[in-house]
Structure formats: structure tokens, C-alpha cells
């Protein structure tokens, strides 16, 4: 695991881990939209992915969702449904396909140990699948959260087919080579109380500026790491709830700009 992604893993571990997400599961179960599990061939492996379709009469853009270090949780599946609610086909690969864990610590350790070539291969396989979805319009973007947010930047540097990248509180690149191949705008969503991650933003801004790339980070004051999930909880504090609402409002505007 790279130094930056390891830093994200540590930051994620400091967030209250995901116990039973009954509130997220209830929202998902009550959704009118179609969601399904699919199997995708990735080399000699088969991975699972969760796909949710929007209710619309025309073809839609597809957003690849890279989950947190907790794995493909009910919250991540619920977020896919919320993307579909906003007209997007969302697909989230389970990067721990074939593994089960009794607690979040087990998932954290397993994800931290995943080989980077395997992660890239699984994301590539999911991207290829996504671009062939009959209801898709050929536009592909990527988003990720925490550990997945760090991978958003990394994967944007690997996949020239991406039209946009949305990184939520993931560490940003620290070397020119890590942004050299980025061919799409990168939008960052960061928590004010998350200096461990935010300290990486200025370097990335300079690297992207030198490379002539678009990078627009926004820091949401008062929020903590993981605010997109924490702010959705029934007992969320006001700072996280407000940051989530503001981030979603911005994200919806950006999603509408996808071709």
C-alpha cells in the first residue's frame, strides 16, 4: 500500500466504525429504484458489484463508487441509490469480494493489505462493465470516500476514460508523476477538522497547476472525517449534517455537468 493510502487508512480508522447501519438499510429497502448485485470477471477472479439505476427515460452517465475502508457497507449501497435518485447509474465494486468479516476491524485490515495491482484490475474490470451497461450513455466518472477517496486521485491517473473524479476526504497526490496522466477534472470534498488529510491539499494543488489540470478542493468547516456518512445518521451533529448537505448540493450541480 502506498504511503498516502496508508495515511488515509489510519484516518479512517480514527472515525467511529460502522456498526449496524439500520438507518441506511431502511432507506435502501424503501427505495423505488432498481438495485441489483452483478458478477464481474476480473482476471482469474470474479468480483461482485452493486448497481442502482435511475428512473429516467433516456440513457444516463455512470459513476463508479469506491467504498470506504470499511468495505461495501449498507451506507455505500445507500449512497449508490442516492446517486440514482439524481439521475446517475451507480456501480460499487466489492473490493473484498469472497471475504466476510465479523467486525469492521477485520475489513480494515483486509483492505489495507490488498495489492494495488489487484485493486486497479478490479476497478478496470468494473469500469469496462460500466461502459457496456445498455442503459448507460458512455460517460464514466468516479467517486470515493476516505480510503476510496485516496484511490479516486490514483485511479484518475490510471484511467483516461474518466470524465470527472470526485474525491471525498481522501489524501491527495504528492508527486508530479501521480497526476501526469489525469485527463479529467478532480473535485475534492474535505472536512474542516481533518488536517491529517487536508495537509496534502496544497501540494496537490501545485502539482495539478503545473500539469495544467483542474483540481477544485472545498473544505467544509466544522465537519469531521467521514461527514458524508456521519452527517446522514439520525443522531448526526449539526456540523457534519450541514457539511453533508452542502457537499451534496455542490455534487448535484457537478453531476448535472456530466455529458
Where are these regions (language model features)?
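Gly/Ala-rich beta-loop-alpha elbow adjacent to hydrolase catalytic centers
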Residues: 144-148, 152
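Bacterial N-terminal signal peptides
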Residues: 5-16
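Serine-hydrolase catalytic machinery in alpha/beta-hydrolase-like enzymes
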Residues: 24, 28-32, 36-131, 228-233
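Short beta-strand/loop motif that positions the catalytic acidic residue
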Residues: 182, 188-190
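Alpha/beta-hydrolase fold nucleophile elbow
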Residues: 134-145
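Acidic catalytic loop of the alpha/beta-hydrolase fold
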Residues: 193-198
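A conserved short beta-strand
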Residues: 161-171
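C-terminal catalytic histidine-bearing segment of alpha/beta-hydrolase fold enzymes
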Residues: 209, 214-259
Amino acid at each position: 500500500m502506498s504511503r498516502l493510502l496508508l495515511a488515509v487508512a489510519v484516518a479512517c480508522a480514527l472515525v467511529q466504525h460502522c456498526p449496524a447501519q439500520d438507518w441506511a438499510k431502511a432507506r435502501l429497502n424503501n427505495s423505488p429504484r432498481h438495485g441489483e448485485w452483478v458478477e464481474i470477471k476480473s482476471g482469474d477472479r470474479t468480483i461482485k458489484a452493486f448497481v442502482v439505476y435511475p428512473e429516467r427515460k433516456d440513457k444516463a452517465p455512470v459513476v463508479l463508487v469506491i467504498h470506504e475502508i470499511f468495505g461495501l457497507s449498507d451506507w455505500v449501497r445507500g449512497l449508490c441509490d442516492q446517486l440514482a435518485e439524481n439521475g446517475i447509474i451507480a456501480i460499487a465494486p466489492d473490493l473484498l469480494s469472497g471475504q466476510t468479516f465479523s467486525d469492521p476491524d477485520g475489513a480494515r485490515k483486509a483492505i489495507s493489505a490488498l495489492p494495488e495491482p489487484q485493486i486497479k484490475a478490479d476497478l478496470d474490470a468494473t469500469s469496462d462493465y460500466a461502459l457496456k451497461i445498455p442503459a448507460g450513455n458512455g460517460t464514466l466518472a468516479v467517486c470515493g470516500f476516505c480510503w476510496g477517496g485516496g484511490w479516486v486521485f490514483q485511479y484518475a491517473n490510471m484511467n483516461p476514460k474518466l470524465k470527472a473524479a470526485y474525491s471525498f476526504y481522501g489524501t491527495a497526490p504528492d508527486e508530479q508523476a501521480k497526476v501526469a496522466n489525469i485527463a479529467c477534472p478532480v473535485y475534492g470534498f474535505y472536512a474542516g477538522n481533518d488536517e491529517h488529510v487536508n495537509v496534502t491539499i496544497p501540494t496537490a494543488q501545485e502539482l495539478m497547476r503545473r500539469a495544467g489540470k483542474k483540481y477544485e478542493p472545498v473544505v467544509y468547516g466544522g465537519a469531521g472525517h467521514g461527514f458524508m456518512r456521519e452527517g446522514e445518521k439520525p443522531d448526526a451533529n449539526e456540523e457534519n449534517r450541514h457539511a453533508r448537505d452542502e457537499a451534496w448540493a455542490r455534487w448535484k450541480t457537478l453531476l448535472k455537468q456530466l455529458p
